UniProtKB/Swiss-Prot annotation:
This is Expansin-A22. The keyword NAD does not apply. It is found in: Secreted, Cell wall; Membrane. Residues 195-275 form the Expansin-like CBD domain.
Length: 280
């Protein structure tokens, strides 16, 4: 049987070579569509999956993030609304005309591209609260950081400095969408006037995003569909003044919560009503 050994060894070598070539080809294809990196460690965040997307990040709002208040999502005072200093304005590519308001992202400085400007082993989780508009007077790679199609985060300065060195000004980052963790229940703030009820929805956990919303007054048993007006604001053109209000809210995962009579009949425009219900 000894003469058969050279053939067996040759067959084994060819087989191993084919497997290695196939694995290398698969690896090259994967690299073309995703960025693979070791998940940075963090004392406050859970370990992230190994697949991240590339972007860049700058900062604004000052050392106390006071300049980030307000914004295109309509959250107003980010401190009182529970968003604090862990927030960011998104470029056009990420903002999605306001539909991304409330979404949470885990971000790390990309040490492979700029090790000298990164704080190693740290991630920060932010909530999308604002829009970073394009600057068509400047090129996308020199000042027009938020110009389409660039994915870009203009982060609150305290959040940015968790992952980057201040002198850099702009850093390459890797990011991924993550579930939002919130304290307490979903909150509703009613603005507008008698025939234009504008409802701001805040403190939304899990996806952070609202897919659809309905309202029902106590004078009816019918749910009335609401329309997203801007940012995290939804409106109804029905006359609901003086009625108890219920809201039916569906998030982007398809989970629906009914907030029955969350608003009492004596409500006033400008008031906020906190529920005990939260998406899970």
């Amino acid at each position: 049987m000894a003469p058969a050994r050279p053939f067996a060894l040759l067959f084994l070598a060819v087989t191993v070579g084919f497997v290695l070539l196939t694995a290398a080809d698969d690896s090259a294809n994967a690299t073309a569509t995703t960025t693979t990196a070791m998940a940075p460690s963090s004392s406050t965040d859970d370990a992230a999956p190994p697949v991240w997307l590339k972007a860049h990040a700058t900062f604004y709002g000052g050392a106390d993030a006071s300049g980030t208040m307000g914004g295109a999502c309509g959250y107003g005072d980010l401190y009182s609304q529970g968003y604090g200093t862990r927030n960011a304005a998104l470029s056009t590519a990420l903002f999605n005309d306001g539909a991304s308001c409330g979404q949470c992202y885990k971000i790390a400085c990309d040490r492979k591209r700029a090790p000298q400007w990164c704080r190693p082993g740290v991630t920060v989780t932010i909530t999308a609260t604002n829009f970073c508009p394009p600057n068509w007077d400047l090129p996308s790679d020199n000042g027009g950081w938020c110009n389409p199609p660039r994915p870009h985060f203009d982060m609150a300065q305290p959040a940015w400095e968790k992952i980057g060195i201040y002198r850099a000004g702009i850093i390459p980052v890797i990011y991924q969408r993550v579930p939002c963790v919130k304290k307490g229940g979903v909150r509703f703030t009613i603005n507008g006037h008698d025939y234009f009820n504008l409802v701001l929805v805040t403190n939304v956990a899990t996806t952070g995003l609202i897919k659809s919303m309905d309202v029902m007054g106590s004078n009816s048993t019918d749910w009335l569909p609401m329309v997203r007006n801007w940012g995290a604001n939804w409106h109804s053109l029905s006359y609901l003044t003086g009625q108890m209000l219920s809201f039916r809210v569906t998030n982007m995962d398809g989970q629906t919560l009914v907030f029955r009579n969350i608003v009492p009949s004596g409500w006033k425009f400008g008031q906020t009503f906190a529920s005990k219900l939260q998406f899970k």
